[in-house]
Amino acid sequence: MLKALHFGAGNIGRGFIGYLLNKSGYEVTFVDISKEIVDNINKYKKYNVIILKEPVEKEEVKEVKALHLEEEDKVLDAFLEADMVTTSVGVSNLSSIGGRLKKYLKARKEKNEKPLDIMACENALFATDVLRERVVKEEDDDFITYLNLKVGFPNTAVDRIVPAVKIDKKLPVDVAVEEFFEWDIEKNKIKGNLQIEGVELVDDLKPYIERKLFLLNGAHATTAYLGYLRGYTYIHQAIKDDNIRAIVKGMQEEISTALSKKYDVDKESLMAYAEKVIKRFENPYLQDEVTRVGREPLRKLSSEDRLIAPLKLCSEVGITPNFILYGIAAGLLFDYKEDAQAVKMREYVEQFGIKKAVNVITGLEEESDLVEEIEKRYFELKGKLI
């Protein structure tokens, strides 16, 4: 049986990556920093994935185990035997995981000649490249030659909404997910024999990553931020608001036009994808809170993330953005007190004023036309709150 080692046993790890690997016949071992999650996985050796649709379905993920991140020797042993290593730890944790992988790979180089594929399954552009850069940093030619020959670092685009919805759990590690999923992998960087059900192997991943990051994640964040300002609790409520829906669809059209120009892709196929995204947001079973989707606004409004990157793309290909600016402005007004980044963002605005704050948060030039347009929408939306 093929063996997979997955770092990050959170909802995405269990409800998407681990679920799909297990379904594809892999023996899955999770690695996590949460003792509670690790202990529960090992206690029950299984969990249920509840698929939120009509009627609700349940699938059992069996014969799984878990290790605590600090169980170094056991994690190393599992790594030495693995055919595939995946992560869903959050982009900010990739550097520290990369440092650990470097140690494990050096040990594997001496003990196992089998090829290995390592994939970062994160909500970010080319996250596996980030992981690989950490692994190869300041390394000698011999180690890098080994990596080039035996270790694949394919980038991925992953997509499945895993909301923090309250469900009737039979086991503490049960997880609820939407029915839809997508997992695209760079074909030309694979070294081993990947056998994952439902995965698409692609020659050029960038259009897939940007389509997902901009048209799904960007639209999701826009719905959340506007929904928060209008007092909605859930995404499915917000997307039914005619004003919010018009802005979200408008920003998707702007982005689809830009992506079709950049990649010479049919705009209609991009708009069909965007329409599917809207339907997913409408699913009332997800009970997806706007505060969950909007969390960490400093990250979501950063230079290469879901809102600023497509804004810059529109500008680069000659499209005058309008609707996308409302999502950014609404994000800047996300003042949820339970979110440390939202609190920090308010401090930036109070300390610097809006234009300088936008520059600090997004990296956009303070005196640029784009920042001026964001400022206009910021005060337009803020005025409606008073």
UniProtKB/Swiss-Prot annotation:
PROSITE patterns: MANNITOL_DHGENASE
Record-listed NAD(+) binding positions: 4-15
UniProt EC number: 1.1.1.17
Keyword terms, alphabetized: NAD, Oxidoreductase
Domain of life from the UniProt record: Bacteria
GO CC list: cytosol
GO molecular function terms noted in the UniProt entry: mannitol-1-phosphate 5-dehydrogenase activity
Reaction it catalyzes: D-mannitol 1-phosphate + NAD(+) = beta-D-fructose 6-phosphate + NADH + H(+)
Entries under Pfam families matching the protein: Mannitol_dh (PF01232), Mannitol_dh_C (PF08125)
GO biological process, one term: mannitol catabolic process
Gene3D superfamilies named in the record: N-(1-d-carboxylethyl)-l-norvaline Dehydrogenase, domain 2, NAD(P)-binding Rossmann-like Domain
InterPro entries xref list: 6-PGluconate_DH-like_C_sf, 6PGD_dom2, Mannitol_1_phos_5_DH, Mannitol_DH, Mannitol_DH_C, Mannitol_DH_CS, Mannitol_DH_N, NAD(P)-bd_dom_sf
PANTHER family according to UniProt: ALTRONATE OXIDOREDUCTASE-RELATED (PTHR30524:SF0), MANNITOL-1-PHOSPHATE 5-DEHYDROGENASE (PTHR30524)
Record-stated family: Belongs to the mannitol dehydrogenase family.
Name this polypeptide is given: Mannitol-1-phosphate 5-dehydrogenase
